[in-house]
């Protein structure tokens, strides 16, 4: 993995910083694990914008990633290759199981082509192996963590993400997340050892607005630059600060206001995030 800073041969190249990984597969992805991915442009079935700043971008295929790994317990798998996935910040690994089936998983850091991985209670403590939390030693770094047994990984899936298993008590284990939050999760839930690959993703710089458009992201217009009919911060003579605490276009507090509303699981959070 190398960080490449481009020479300023043009305004669009001046600020480009790329992350180059020579281990990534340079050919086509595994066709049976691809699905059509249609674009909505941020519109719902009525044609109205429900998600702002979405539209355009390069056509993509969705890679079917196995977030469960619970039906391959005890079957060893060989990592065939590490691939780029346009749908996520992490890289993905193509596994070939001993029974001949191939599946994609989120590529753990340090795992490369030719490595042997396995899932199940008897799996050794090694990066890339998937176990129930009750079988993982306290202090281990993990990713791809389930919140409900059998539902599939939901926590720590993006590039460089991980959590630490810090305690085990009864049917629950306690995790420390990267945000600083400490929460309890059922010990039956699964997780993968190690941290997610491509941790240098945060060091890249796209360099120009067009590179963002290639990824399907449209411009963000500030509320203070709009008219009063379009945003609560709009209008005024000359440049203004908005005249009130920051709010969304619909008047809800933003920029730091707490939005968590799921009180049902509050008792699972030991310490709130920082």
Swiss-Prot record:
SUPFAM superfamilies tied to this protein: Nucleic acid-binding proteins, Translation proteins SH3-like domain
Statement: the UniProt record of this protein carries the keyword rRNA-binding: yes
Renumbered residue ranges of the record's region Disordered: 28-55, 224-274
Keywords: Ribonucleoprotein, Ribosomal protein, RNA-binding, rRNA-binding
Alphabetized SMART domains for the sequence: Ribosomal_L2, Ribosomal_L2_C
GO cellular component terms, semicolon-separated: large ribosomal subunit
InterPro entries from the UniProt entry: NA-bd_OB-fold, Rib_uL2_dom2, Ribosomal_uL2, Ribosomal_uL2_bac/org-type, Ribosomal_uL2_C, Ribosomal_uL2_CS, Ribosomal_uL2_dom3, Ribosomal_uL2_RNA-bd_dom
GO BP of this protein: cytoplasmic translation
PANTHER family to which the protein is assigned, alphabetical: LARGE RIBOSOMAL SUBUNIT PROTEIN UL2M (PTHR13691:SF5), RIBOSOMAL PROTEIN L2 (PTHR13691)
Role this protein plays: One of the primary rRNA binding proteins. Required for association of the 30S and 50S subunits to form the 70S ribosome, for tRNA binding and peptide bond formation. It has been suggested to have peptidyltransferase activity; this is somewhat controversial. Makes several contacts with the 16S rRNA in the 70S ribosome.
Name of protein: Large ribosomal subunit protein uL2
